[in-house]
């Protein structure tokens, strides 16, 4: 709209200049004409020329006005076309953006889809055909990959006990064998004598053998840790063998 206003102002200035030129020309023609009564032909000729000049000026001014009006209409049409073009561009941009987003989503869906031929009933052995003539076999059961399983609360706090190493089991077996030998020797001595009285050494030894499990249970209850399941470093028999002696 500012351009249109500037164009209108320029056209108005041109019209004013033409009007000034017309007035100046009329004054110049009046000054040049000589007021003599003996030359009626010259006055008539000057009047005819003025009329012709005024008529031509009016025609030119009308043409200028018509041209200005045409220019104004053309400018309005250009502005309307510019607005329409900008709206069309915006709509096209929106459509292209929506189409691109839809295509991108479709590509993602295609990539995420699994092969329809896969099923859970397939065999565990798959054939991998390489450039070599002989096919290579791969089994999931004998694969190298092993996933570590963390300990569960049921494994840690349950009735199951931790398996000892062979080095920890052997000394315990030896102590059990020694205890059984001593008990058998005491039984043989008592049967041979046939009396209920026992020697002080054997009674002390039996007392020590009877008191020993209670000490071991106290040590285990005080020093052992429940969460870790690690046994004490002392070679003590398990509490399951307190009541049973072989």
Curated annotation (Swiss-Prot):
Glycosylation site positions: 219
Compositional bias annotation for Polar residues: 172-183, 235-246
Region called Disordered, residue ranges: 29-54, 93-114, 148-246
Top-level lineage group: Eukaryota
Alphabetized UniProt keyword annotations: Glycoprotein
Keyword Glycoprotein applies: yes
Low complexity compositional bias, start-end: 35-49, 190-203, 214-225
Entry keyword annotation includes Cell membrane: no
Protein name (Swiss-Prot/TrEMBL): Uncharacterized protein T25D10.4
Organism of provenance: Caenorhabditis elegans
